[in-house]
Amino acid sequence: MDSRLQEIRERQKLRRQLLAQQLGAESADSIGAVLNSKDEQREIAETRETCRASYDTSAPNAKRKYLDEGETDEDKMEEYKDELEMQQDEENLPYEEEIYKDSSTFLKGTQSLNPHNDYCQHFVDTGHRPQNFIRDVGLADRFEEYPKLRELIRLKDELIAKSNTPPMYLQADIEAFDIRELTPKFDVILLEPPLEEYYRETGITANEKCWTWDDIMKLEIDEIAAPRSFIFLWCGSGEGLDLGRVCLRKWGYRRCEDICWIKTNKNNPGKTKTLDPKAVFQRTKEHCLMGIKGTVKRSTDGDFIHANVDIDLIITEEPEIGNIEKPVEIFHIIEHFCLGRRRLHLFGRDSTIRPGWLTVGPTLTNSNYNAETYASYFSAPNSYLTGCTEEIERLRPKSPPPKSKSDRGGGAPRGGGRGGTSAGRGRERNRSNFRGERGGFRGGRGGAHRGGFPPR
């Protein structure tokens, strides 16, 4: 206790010395000569008491606190002098221009000193895109923590490699070539048109003819598509998102998925591209629209599709400026999903020639396509399918089995209990259209009529 009291006295003595220097007094003992006399202080106290009586209740709590705590005028004056001294010391400090260096001043949360994952601000600071920090995006390490899926992918890749046809390719100007000559009908069609958008973004002159969406719509894709088939259309990231859907409808497809290619810049952070004149921001992704033709249900058509094996995202490093190559992962997604072996790649290049695919494009340097030879690979019944092993069937994700009518609530068992003409809940009424039984003509979830009107 004595040490604490001694510490307080020393601090008070030091405070009085600082006040003496601030007020121009000779010593700490002569501060009273500089300050108001006792009579003047008494007058000030009386004035404060008078003002306190009429003090507005809306005044700041800090001001009322000083009056309520009963502090002496000398203590208040000392505190005021301390604040004044601190303020003057801050004003005397040399001015330093604040230079923005990082995002530490923009932390999320007012009570936290920990930097949060503000990847957008980090991109402004370093040039690293937010997608650079997504983990396990490669084909090799994507399923490291999912052994069941990893084994499924391995088995499917082995089966696909065994069932693939030899690679075939045809050098042809697709604009002048009649694609109806390609036989037989295809289960999967991949279109990779050289859109003007790709070259407009990079500012590089195209070394091949750029296709407009009007040109793409003129392709007779519906003539070479099987009744039950899928199409994958690379459409960029601009107007192609809408015009690509128009193409799918024209060819008889329904859009069922949108595969998004997210481009990272780990190897070259901060790189800026030529801004597309039609864009507000720099685009770092592209879209591949997926369409379905015919009736294909994942719960019943397990011989033709295996759903939920891959995701609808492709995350790879952005190619060099002028390179319009698409990621090879799109082929893996298609082959894992659709079990059809008749696969066509339009606007292909030498680098995209692949077993199991017929590649057609104007930039190919050679051709080996023979219609009869290609058709012979699928002459046997159901030979257009890759097939499936028992182990793959066991491992692959499946849809829940369809419920029976009694489980869904339809049919007679539920209709007689909750709805229908003899409703089980509630007492019978003599009125023919009484609706208190949750059934009758109102349609009591399984009764004779689903809605409020009889069927036409």
From Swiss-Prot:
Superkingdom of the source species: Eukaryota
Effect seen on changing residue 399 to A/E: Does not affect interaction with METTL3
Keyword set, alphabetical order: Differentiation, Nucleus, Phosphoprotein, RNA-binding, Spermatogenesis
A GO CC annotation given for this chain: RNA N6-methyladenosine methyltransferase complex
Substitution effect: residue 312 to A: Decreased methyltransferase activity of the heterodimer complex formed with METTL3
Oligomeric and partner information: Heterodimer; heterodimerizes with METTL3 to form an antiparallel heterodimer that constitutes an active methyltransferase. Component of the WMM complex, a N6-methyltransferase complex composed of a catalytic subcomplex, named MAC, and of an associated subcomplex, named MACOM. The MAC subcomplex is composed of METTL3 and METTL14. The MACOM subcomplex is composed of WTAP, ZC3H13, CBLL1/HAKAI, VIRMA, and, in some cases of RBM15 (RBM15 or RBM15B).
Membership in a protein family: Belongs to the MT-A70-like family.
Role description: The METTL3-METTL14 heterodimer forms a N6-methyltransferase complex that methylates adenosine residues at the N(6) position of some mRNAs and regulates the circadian clock, differentiation of embryonic stem cells and cortical neurogenesis. In the heterodimer formed with METTL3, METTL14 constitutes the RNA-binding scaffold that recognizes the substrate rather than the catalytic core. N6-methyladenosine (m6A), which takes place at the 5'-[AG]GAC-3' consensus sites of some mRNAs, plays a role in mRNA stability and processing.
Protein name as it appears in the record: N(6)-adenosine-methyltransferase non-catalytic subunit METTL14
